[in-house]
Design a protein with these regions (language model features):
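Bimodal "functional hotspot" detector
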Residues: 1-167
């Protein structure tokens, strides 16, 4: 950091355009999670590490991250199963029975059944990291979006076939 004398006082010459916080504050306020995106072949879900503010909006922030797409480091090698231009209508609600209700915009209704299954798998992999979430349910316009087999939700263990580690 360069310093310059200005009017008899020392000033930082080229301050960075960022907020600098102590590590203790960051560790207390944020938690590391992974957003999961499919590789270009669609056979593997790859993690994209992010830091999310701790609190009751963790699931909402994770879904917003998925909808924003992968970060720069993996953008070229991944893709999202969530339909483009899909938005989160409200906050993700986690019911007492552990169902994460993900209210998406109506664009999700344009997905084919296969695309919807992959979108649920992508959401499940990402949301399984949140304690208390056991199942995922996508809604659009306030109504559950039907999944393959007439189901309206899926366990967070969905998509185990996409594990690169084979576990």
């Amino acid at each position: 950091i360069g310093l310059v004398s200005e009017g008899g006082q020392w000033r930082i010459e080229n301050p960075i355009d960022a907020l600098v916080v102590p590590t203790s504050f960051f560790d207390r306020s944020f938690a590391r999670f992974n957003l999961y995106f499919f590789d270009q072949t669609g056979r593997v879900l790859l993690p994209d590490p992010v830091f999310i503010p701790r609190g009751e909006q963790t699931a909402t922030n994770l879904v917003r991250g998925l909808l924003a797409g992968p970060g720069d480091t993996i953008r070229e090698i991944t893709r999202s199963a969530l339909p483009s231009r899909t938005d989160l209508d409200l906050s993700v609600v986690v019911t007492e029975s552990g169902v994460a209700e993900v209210p998406l915009s109506r664009e999700v209704l344009q997905a084919t059944p296969a695309e919807l299954t992959r979108a649920v798998d992508q959401l499940a992999w990402t949301l399984r990291q949140v304690p208390g979430i056991d199942r995922v349910r996508i809604t659009a316009g306030g109504a559950p979006v039907p999944l393959a087999g007439g189901r309206v939700d899926a366990p967070v263990t969905s998509g185990s076939q996409f594990d690169a580690g084979g576990s």
